[in-house]
Amino acid sequence: MAENNTTPAAGGSTGRHSHKKHGFTGQIGFVMAAAGSAVGVGNLWRFPYLAAKDGGGLFILIYLILTFTFGFTLLTSDIAIGRKTGKNSIKAYTAMSPKWSFLGILTFLVPVLIMTYYAVIGGWITRYIVVYLTGQNQLAAADSFFTDFITSPSQSTLYAVIFMLLTAWIVFNGVEKGIEQCSKILMPVMLVMIVAIAIFALTLTHTDDAGVTRTGLQGLAVYLTPNFEGLTIKRFLQILLDAMSQIFFSLSVSMGIMITYGSYIKKDVDINASIHQIELFDTGVALLAGMMIIPSIFVFEGVEGMKAGPSLMFISLPKVFASMPSLGRFVGLAFFIMAAFAALTSCVSVLETITANCMEIFHTKRKPTTITLTLVYTIASVVIALGYSKFYIELPLPNGSIGQLLDLMDYISNSFMMPFISMLSAILIGWVVGPDWIVEEVEYGGRKFGLKGLYRVMIKYIVPVIMFILFLTSAGILNI
């Protein structure tokens, strides 16, 4: 299909004068908020887990290459779409091409699903903060603690509701006074905390019952050294797909969040520079998370301990903190506070995206819209939290795993819908409106877009193919 630059918004009239009245005050506010959305719980447990599983430095190298090519392309697309149209995902895609309005609806459904369970995870983290605040760190290290907590109807729902209300309060206060102000405070504090814990992790040393001494620096070497043992073409493709799926978890792309945040930025903000800053911040936090977690796990539990998946944060790390000297309680508290900051800024961005779309569709004001959505998602969070007790079910997922309600929502939104949306978005930009539709917005006001050649190639040829493969793999149709 030939490129077509004659669609309604392609000429620029749709977006040049549609900037929203209430938005970020400037580039710093936007970058902090966008980075806050990107830096989530996935950076803290999933990235270190995949690095340990997929060859350490080999995974890191592949991830970095994909972030600054593949991730850069998707992030540029979402932010430019938002600013050029001045609209949220549902109406933004309609402005690009009326025949593709269905893509906006699909994109909107992703945060709608994610919001049902994100406050539940935030509630889990909040529970651990309370445990460490009250000096019960040895209790948190017990094998049954996490399971006992999530299967307790009263405890799991209470903390989910608390986290949901905190998220809603920030969104209720708007973009500038709520989201931007929150991000400007939480993100720098979180960065300082993760750097401090990472440095502390490198100083750790422990001798086990067998007399083997392991150090944090040895754990760092395990983390950063590329491991090519047993590497085959099939294994390399698995690592590649793992790295690409992590980018979805990490950069908040293909879920409408960056379109919404893009619609809030002013025309004098340099999109290209902002994107590089977001990528550096997000990737830096992921790398530091690995530097913090892998050496800590390695010192006290060895290589075997690093194979834990989602349980790493809530089961493995509390054991590590309990094994530390007197500082274990305080390190554990600092870690979970940092994790709460990451979860909160991400959860806020998800709820804000839903709120902004609803305000635009139904022509309602922020406060009543936020209150209504808070009621809806408080109920949804309670239902999902009870998925481990009152509403417990076992669901076979296409990837071969068995999950509960939370896992089902996560699979549909992250593993199934997001690759599909990215593929369709790339086709729309690359072959319907044309890459220059995006390039023009990035270069607006005489700004330089040095990587526009790379962007054109990625959005037209590489992203659609990779996303199609990832979609087939996630759907269980293609087994790599």
Predicted regions and their residues:
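Membrane-interface "cap" regions at the ends of multi-pass membrane proteins
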Residues: M1-W45, L74-I79, R83-A95, S101-F102, ...
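Helix-loop-helix connectors at the membrane interface of multi-pass transporters/channels
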Residues: A2-N4, G122-T151, G262-D268, A273, ...
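Membrane-embedded translocation segments of transport machinery
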Residues: G12, H17-F24, K184-L344, V348, ...
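Inter-helical loop and helix-membrane interface segments of multi-pass membrane transporters/permeases
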Residues: S18-K21, L50-D54, K87-L106, A119-G178, ...
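Transmembrane helix-boundary motif of multi-pass solute transporters/channels
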Residues: G26-L66, G256-I257, A273-H276, L280-T283
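Loop-to-transmembrane helix boundary motifs in multi-pass membrane proteins
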Residues: G29, P153-L158, F281-L287, R329-G332, ...
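Membrane-water interface regions at transmembrane-helix termini and the short interhelical loops
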Residues: L50-D54, A80, A95-M96, F102-M115, ...
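C-terminal membrane-solvent junction of multi-pass transporters and transport-like membrane proteins
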Residues: L103, T355, F362-T374, D410-M467
